[in-house]
C-alpha cells in the first residue's frame, strides 16, 4: 500500500489515501485510518499548506450540499474508489515506475491528494491480456469498452467489484462521457448501432486523457456534486448484454443496445426531465456467482468492512443538464471559457435541443393535421351553403318574374272584384236571415219577465185573494190608494158600508175568498207585511158575508122558553165581526156533534174503542131527538160567562172557523170538518201539541173550549138582568142566527137551541149597558162531569192533555 507523506512543522504522519476528492469549498479531508478514542484531540496546522490533519474521523459538512443535516447522503463514493490503493500496489508489482511515482503525491504546491482511478484506467488500457475488452480508439483520445460478464471479472481484479454501472459512474465523475454522433441521420445511426451494439466509446471532456500523455493525467480531478449534477451522463444498465446468471446482476438497469444507451446518456427524455429521481443509479453488493463459496464469503466480509470504513456515498440524481447557472470556479481547475468550449457540453446541448424540438414538431404536426381536417369540413359546409343560396336566388328571381306578369295582367283585377262581390252578397244574405230570427226571439223576453214578475207578485201577495188567478200583474196596484195599512182585502178604510161580496169590496183587485178548501192557502203564523195589532185597542170591524147555514131542527118550545137579550141601538150589521176576536181569539177546537158524527172515518179511529164510542153517541142523539126534554133536566138559568158566550157563538156560527180570510191562519179544530182535507194544517195553536193530538182518541160527548180573548174587558154582570134558559140536554145539530128584537131601552136576544150570543153582541151590550142572561156555568160543568164519569176509561190520560190545552 502506498503512503502519502505530508510535512507539517517537522512532523511526519502516515495515512492511507482517502477515496474522496477534496471539496470545492476547501474543506479539509480527513484521515480514514487515524480513528482513535480521543475524538476531540487537537491537530496542528501546517503553515505552508494551511492543511489540518486531524486524528479523528467526522464527516465533513458541505455548505453547498442540499442536505446539511444528513451529509452522509450527499457524498458519493464507490467500492472501486476504495480499492484504488490495492490497485496501485498491483501496478507497482508489474514493474511500471510511472504508477509508483504517481501514487506518491507531492502536495507541496497543490495541497491535494493524487487520484488513483485515472491511473488504474490507464493501466487497464495498456494491459494486453484484456485488450479485447478495453482498448484505445484510432484517434488515441478515447477508448472502447465492451461490457459483459468477462469485463465484470476484470473489474474485480482492479477495483474489487464487478458492477459495470459503478465503473461507468466513476468515469462520469472524472469527466468522461460517451461519444455520440449528432450529425448522422437516423438511418446511419441505426447502422452504426447495429455494428457497435456491444461497444461503448468514452472520451474525456477536456482531452486530458490521451495515450502516451501521462503528465496530463494530473489535471484530471474528481468533480463535486454540483458539477456532476450539471454534467453527469447516465447509462441505463438494462442495455447491458445478458450474462449467464442475469438474476445475480439484475439491479434495475440493463443495456439493450447502444442506441438505447445513447438515448439515455445524451438525449434526456421528457419523462426523465420531469422525474429525475426515477433514474438514480444504485450500487449493489452482489458477489460473482462463478467464484467458489469460500471466496464469496471472504469477499462479502471484505465488502462489509469496506462499507463501514469508506465514506458514505452521495447519490447522483439523473436530471437534465443545467446550463443556466454559473459554474463554480473552484470546482474544476479550468477557466469558464475552456468549460464552454468542451465538446461534450456542446453535444449534450445540441442533443437535448434536438430532442425537445422534435417533440415540439410532433405536437405541432398533430395540431396542424387537426386544423386541416377542420378546415376541410368547413370548406364542405361552405360549398353546401353556397349551393343552397344559389338555388334560393334562382327561385326568388322566378317568383319576381311571375309577379311582374300578374301585375301587368288586368284579368286578375276583374277576378278579384268578382270574388269580393260574391263574398259581400253572401254576407248580406246571412245578415237578412239573422234579423228576423232576432225579431222572433224578442217577444219571448218580456213574457219571461212577466212570468218572473208574476211569480214575485204571487210570492209576495200569497195571502191576498182574487177571483182571477191568471190576472195581469201590471193592473193589480192601479186602484189602490196610498194608505198606512198593509194590503189586506178585509180592512175597510172607507166610510160607507158596501154590500157584502169580495167583487164589490175589492173592485176586482184582489182574488175572492176560497171558503171551501183551506189547504190551498199558504198558511203562516203572522203576516210579514202586517204589524202586530194591539190587543186592547184593536176594534177594527171586518166585513164578511152572511154565512149560509143548513136548516136547523130545534124544539120550538125550547126556543120560546129561552130568554131574550136586548141589544143596544148602535149594533153593527150582522155582516161585520170584531177584528180582535178574529185575530187573537183561539176558536173552539171542537165542532158540533153533527159534524163529529157525519165526518168521514180516518185512520186514527180504527180502534174498537173508538167505534164503540161512536155508536153510543149515535144512540144518544137519536134518543134526544125523539124524546121530549123533561122539566127536571132543565138546569137553573144563570148568566153566562164570557167564555161560555164565545163557546155558544162558536156553536151558532160554525162557518167562522172555516171562513176566516185574514193574514193569520185559522186554528185547526180537534175534529176536522168532513169537507176539509184529512191532513191537519200546522199553525201556532197546534204545533206544540201535534204529537199528542195524533195519538188522542176523540170523544163525541166531550166539548172543550179554549181560553177567552183578552181584548174584551171583563164587566160585572148584574143580577137583575133577565136570564136565558139553556138546557144542557138540548144538542142541536146546527145553529141558526139569534132572533134579535130591538126596543127603546134595550135589545133582547133569544138564543135558540142552547146557543150563546156572539162576542160582538156581548160587547155591544156591555157598551150600551144592557144585560144579557146566560145559562149557568155549573150546569155545563155538571154535564161535563157526567160525561167524564161515563167515560172513565180514558180520564187519566185525557186529564193531562186538557190541562195543556
Curated annotation (Swiss-Prot):
Signal peptide: none annotated. Residues 117-226 bind DNA. Residues 71-85 have a biased composition (Basic and acidic residues). Residues 1-24, 86-110, 295-310, 557-566, 637-659 have a biased composition (Low complexity). Its main location: nucleus. One of its GO terms (cellular component) is nuclear chromosome. This is Transcription factor SFL1. It is found in: Nucleus. Residues 1-110, 273-336, 438-483, 513-675, 691-746, 759-805 are annotated as: Disordered. GO terms for molecular function: DNA-binding transcription factor activity; RNA polymerase II-specific DNA-binding transcription factor binding; sequence-specific DNA binding. Belongs to the HSF family. Pfam families: HSF_DNA-bind. Keywords: DNA-binding, Nucleus, Repressor, Transcription, Transcription regulation, Virulence. Residues 25-69, 454-480, 533-556, 581-597, 604-614, 622-635, 716-738 have a biased composition (Polar residues). Disruption phenotype: Enhances flocculation, filamentous growth, and hypha-specific gene expression in several media and at several growth temperatures. Transcription factor that plays a role of repressor of filamentous growth and flocculation. Antagonizes functions of SFL2 and FLO8. Plays a role in the hyphal repression induced by secreted factors like dodecanol by competitors such as Pseudomonas aeruginosa and Burkholderia cenocepacia. The gene is SFL1. The keyword Transcription applies. It comes from the Eukaryota. SUPFAM superfamilies: Winged helix' DNA-binding domain. One of its GO terms (biological process) is negative regulation of transcription by RNA polymerase II. The lineage of its organism: Eukaryota, Fungi, Dikarya, Ascomycota, Saccharomycotina.
